[in-house]
Amino acid sequence: MGDRPRRNCGTRRRRHNELFDALPVRLFSATGRGPIEVLVRWDGERFVEMPGHVATIDDAPETGRFEVNARAYGLMQTLCDLVENGAVLTFDYGYPQEELWAPFRTTGTLLAFYKHTAHEDPYIHVGEQDLTTHVNFSELQAAAEESGMDVAGLVSQSEFLYCVGLGQVVEQARGEMGEYFTRRRALEQLTDGAGLGRIRVLAATRGVEGEPPGFEGCQ
């Protein structure tokens, strides 16, 4: 993306879905001396963890484990700098920093998915499973604002889709029951509060008057 021109002319909309939660992260463990990075080595039979150096991290949790996504801030700025007039829409699992690093979240958010089953051991099925962490939306908002963007959100994907009128799209198919039930099942899946509906949506806009579609009255 670094080879692309900055601030493309015209109105642009850039949407990305679950981009930031797929980036590599650094894992830390809070101690009385400060956060210590959790490193990994091979002991000849398996991957094992080992303590790294004490790090300085602003507002770091005082207990438990947490992740830092070192690439998210710069990537968000790169995306924003590609837009002269328009919006960057971010769809991802995550929280504002105060929720992400809340005291009760002592094990962090690192998860592994193997054959569509979630578990918490990233050191098995190496190369055969997906690893993911929740996104720090406070960091993405700060990056967008530093790039001169206006920020709207956070809202849930469920709120966003209903606000842009997806419910009406379903109702428009009532005259054709097969299509109606297909659309309704899709809407239920996308807005399920225990699943995809929990995805958060953040909008960063430039040259857009008022709140962007999907965010009016939803915050």
Say what each PLM segment does.
Residues M1-D3:
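Short, flexible loop/hinge motifs at secondary-structure junctions
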Residues P5, C9-G32, R65-A70, G74, ...:
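A short SAM/SAH-binding and catalytic strip from SAM-dependent methyltransferases
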Residues G10, G34-I36, R198:
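A generic structural signal for well-ordered coil/turn residues at beta-strand boundaries
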Residues R15-P61, P103-Y114:
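A mobile, often basic/glycine-rich helix-loop segment
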Residues G52-Q219:
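Long, Lys/Arg- and hydrophobic-enriched amphipathic alpha-helices
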